[in-house]
Amino acid sequence: MDFLNYPEPLADLITGLSRLPGIGPKTAGRLAFYLLQQPQVAENLAEAMIRAQREIRQCSLCCNYTDHDPCPICTGEKRERTLLCIVEQPRDVVSLEKTREFKGLYHVLHGVISPLEGVGPEQLTISKLLGRLEGVQEVVMAMNPTVEGEATALYLSRLLKPLGIKVTRIAHGLPVGGDLEYADEITIARALEGRRQI
């Protein structure tokens, strides 16, 4: 998008906003003009971003984002310490916690193995994971069902199984409200594999 007709600070704001995931130049322009018309919203947003950058860090145990180290999940007295769920990103922890079903601990990899993008095991938090397995009896792989997610889960399972740790994978299949007609073959196959008695 051509920002030549905009004052430089506005053009910089639009450019900065358009670098955010899912925000194209037109949406960035709309957001920029909104922020200019709502100075208090803009100030609050700027302060929140600066505060998050200053105060949020990775938990030294699970690598999730937190403002306390170790994080409240890792220090939670009611958490099942023999059960560890491995996820790709911090937002995955939030998704799992919303279900109120998982009572164990987490480990955030901050990505997946992706040779095409130059991401190998050493770029992930795998070494920290291997250092915190004492007492863990089961590891639940909760990676996304992508080629990279599957490769990462397979890599980790090969590391963990020789340690005598049970390695499981979350079930994949049709979403609630999904329609078989529109599902791809892999999704249907996974749904069949993950079937259970009712």
Swiss-Prot record:
Q: Which Pfam families match?
A: RecR_C, RecR_HhH, RecR_ZnF, Toprim_4
Single Gene Ontology BP annotation: DNA repair
GO MF terms here are: DNA binding; zinc ion binding
List cystine links: none
Task: Give the Toprim domain ranges.
Answer: 82-175
| Family, similarity comment | Belongs to the RecR family.
Q: What does this protein do?
A: May play a role in DNA repair. It seems to be involved in an RecBC-independent recombinational process of DNA repair. It may act with RecF and RecO.
Q: What is this protein called?
A: Recombination protein RecR
Query: What organism does this protein naturally occur in?
Result: Desulfitobacterium hafniense (strain DSM 10664 / DCB-2)
